[in-house]
């Protein structure tokens, strides 16, 4: 029987609050999780930008109410999430991609998924002219000692949520108020900084989609329209 590449629907969600993006991905994951067999699952790749927000993952216990208040006073929101990883920033100029996949259609392994996600981002960076981008023992994708892409995922019953935040033309000053992903002595960078030109999210999206289809060996289809809310998808 010939191999049929899994189908993934691309949802271009635009810019909105972190809460709205979280509700969208949770709804998509919940609506499909009950399906059996996994072949019936509808896979999604949600592309978006967030309003300024600091998020902390499952392992973060260090950020107190005072820390949260300090960060909110900068003009950003603050959320505790169910993803892996420590604190990071999302905001305008950053391409956030949330793959909502049933790994039963790919490889049923969270370890494989994280490694493939890393490979996908590295491939996309190479396509955009950053040949030195690579994965290391530290989470995320790096250019030298500077992180260009954060990775934090959640998996339940082989259904993935959360994903990546690729700095395109992000204002990197937001990162100066935290220790990104809890890694001391390292910095952050962006496509714009590395390539010495303005690199918008829309331009990066094309390379990311090309890389995603190639590395995950899947077919991509565009969702019919940009959703105004999670209720418009299903």
Curated annotation (Swiss-Prot):
One of its GO terms (biological process) is protein lipoylation. The record marks 147 as: Lowers pKa of active site Cys. It is found in: Mitochondrion. Substrate binds at residues 83-90, 150-152, 163-165. Residues 1-28 form a transit peptide. SUPFAM superfamilies: Class II aaRS and biotin synthetases (SSF55681). InterPro entries: aa-tRNA-synth_II/BPL/LPL (IPR045864), BPL_LPL_catalytic (IPR004143), Octanoyltransferase (IPR000544), Octanoyltransferase_CS (IPR020605). The keyword Zinc does not apply. Pfam families: LplA-B_cat. In the reaction, the free carboxyl group of octanoic acid is attached via an amide linkage to the epsilon-amino group of a specific lysine residue of lipoyl domains of lipoate-dependent enzymes. It catalyses: octanoyl-[ACP] + L-lysyl-[protein] = N(6)-octanoyl-L-lysyl-[protein] + holo-[ACP] + H(+). This is Putative lipoyltransferase 2, mitochondrial. The keyword Membrane does not apply. The active site is at 181 (acyl-thioester intermediate). Belongs to the LipB family. The lineage of its organism: Eukaryota, Metazoa, Ecdysozoa, Arthropoda, Hexapoda. PROSITE patterns: BPL_LPL_CATALYTIC, LIPB. Keywords: Acyltransferase, Mitochondrion, Transferase, Transit peptide. Catalyzes the transfer of endogenously produced octanoic acid from octanoyl-acyl-carrier-protein onto the lipoyl domains of lipoate-dependent enzymes. Lipoyl-ACP can also act as a substrate although octanoyl-ACP is likely to be the physiological substrate. One of its GO terms (molecular function) is lipoyl(octanoyl) transferase activity. GO terms for cellular component: mitochondrion. Pathway: Protein modification; protein lipoylation via endogenous pathway; protein N(6)-(lipoyl)lysine from octanoyl-[acyl-carrier-protein]: step 1/2.
């Amino acid at each position: 029987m010939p191999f049929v590449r899994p189908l993934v629907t691309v949802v271009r969600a635009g810019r909105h609050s972190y809460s709205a993006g979280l509700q969208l991905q949770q709804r998509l994951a919940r609506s499909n999780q009950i399906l059996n067999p996994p072949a019936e699952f509808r896979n999604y790749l949600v592309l978006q930008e967030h309003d300024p927000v600091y998020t902390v993952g499952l392992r973060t216990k260090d950020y107190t109410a005072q820390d949260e208040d300090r960060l909110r006073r900068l003009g950003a929101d603050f959320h505790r999430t169910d993803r892996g990883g420590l604190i990071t920033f999302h905001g305008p100029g950053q391409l956030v991609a949330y793959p909502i996949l049933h790994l039963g259609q790919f490889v049923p392994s969270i370890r494989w998924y994280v490694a493939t996600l890393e490979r996908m981002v590295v491939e996309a960076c190479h396509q955009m002219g950053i040949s030195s981008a690579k994965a290391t023992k530290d989470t995320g994708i790096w250019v030298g000692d500077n992180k260009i892409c954060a990775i934090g995922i959640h998996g339940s019953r082989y259904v993935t949520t959360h994903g990546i935040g690729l700095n395109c033309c992000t204002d990197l000053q937001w990162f100066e108020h935290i220790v990104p992903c809890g890694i001391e002595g390292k910095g952050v960078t962006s496509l714009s900084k590395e390539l010495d030109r303005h690199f918008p999210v829309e331009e990066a999206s094309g390379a990311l989609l090309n890389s995603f289809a190639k590395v995950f060996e899947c077919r991509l289809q565009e969702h019919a329209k940009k959703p105004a809310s999670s209720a418009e998808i299903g």
